[in-house]
Amino acid sequence: MIYNIYNKVANITLFSLLILFFMSSCSDEMSIKMQYGDRDQLFKQKYEPIPGPRTCFWRRGPVSKDPYINIAYPDAGVFYWNAAFTVPEGAKLYLEGEFPHARYMSLISYDGRGAPIESLADYLIIPNHNSTNPFIDGSKRKNRNRSYKVEIVNLPPEIRRKEGTRIDLKSDIKDSNIDKNNSNSNSLNAAQYGNGQQSIVYRIYVPDKNRNESGGVPLPEVVLVLNNGEELRGEKACDALRSNQAPQISIDAIGLPMTVYSKLLKQPGKPDTWPATVPPTWYLQYDREFLLGIYNGQLPKSFRKSTGGFYPNLDNNYVRTIINRKHGKVFVLKGKLPNTPKTFHGDEFMSKGDMVYWSICSNQGFANTRVNDCLFDEQVPVNNKGEYTIVISRVEDRPRNAFPECGIGWLPMADDGDGAIDEDVTVIQIRNMLSSPEFKHAIQNVSDIGKEKDIMGPYLPFSFYTTTGAFEVLFPCMN
């Protein structure tokens, strides 16, 4: 890295000297005064720190859409923090925190390729004595006493919980006296990988309006109990955990290497719009092989859903399609929105729904893994039947009626497309989080590749390409 910077400086300096020579040879009156420090002026930029809270343990984050750290396909309505650490031999690691004022929170452990190990979702966490878990169906969301304590264990999961679907627990009750004898325990399995590294991601979905990134509460505090009984907190705990260690992840954990991505795009015999089809083709998210299979046709080796992305959330199931602006500058989706809890405006009680959360995102390509923007359920304009129309286009092509005032949602395409090679590529992704067992149209219920529409029905949107003018005349706005 230092070598590259030095070369750039040397090249710029040489370029400046050549200009000096040229100008001096043209006119004796022209001169350039080279002063010490001029080189530094070329590289001066205003320091702008990444917004949002961090701690010595939660060092990496917040990850979200711009201006936050934008990598690994974050949902724009979500904030993520990562911790990489090593629990000393014989020690015990705990996280003490308060439930945030938000739609959802979780702690999820990962391996060195960014594949999830286990999720501990909010509703599975038993609160401390005299505290309330506000994520339990029917709970009061604004109670002040909302603390919890979770142990992080260096073990692989003994039993894999059903993923993506909300489990019906005894704790789904309105009061705070949760049955302490239920099958859930406040622990997360975060097995070591590489040279003893452990990794977890803390997520907060849709903080209540006017709350900060962490949902109006501090980030969970790390507590380390050594094998001699000594308790460490704060910086001392972080030092013992080596929480400043470099991540031991594979090169494709947060995005495909450019060499791999380039080969996927430039396959012999494929059109320059590949793999975008007309009409669009939707793909479930299984493992990494099937993610690449969108381009090369390979099938999944594992049918465990939601593991093939870049640090995916086990509580979500995903479908995605890849679109290409060469097929049309305006992409339209028409579908039906599932019922979800309403929380953004500080609703008093946590309600049930078809699922906990729904969103649709416009993203860049698999090498870039940047999100352009998303709409989550409470942001989507719907008619009295719960149906939506969403437009995806560049800003310059946005129809004048593609605004909430006209009952139309809108998401941007990036001007540089996939952010790497093809300026016309956009990746569209839909999330279904913790669906109810009673809701039969969730992504979670699709078990066969190619049967997405059969199961999801109107909840998998009908979509098509068009032009700005055509959309404006097809969907007149009376406002």
What annotation goes with each model-predicted range?
Residues 27-29:
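C-terminal intrinsically disordered regulatory tails that are low-complexity, acidic/proline-rich
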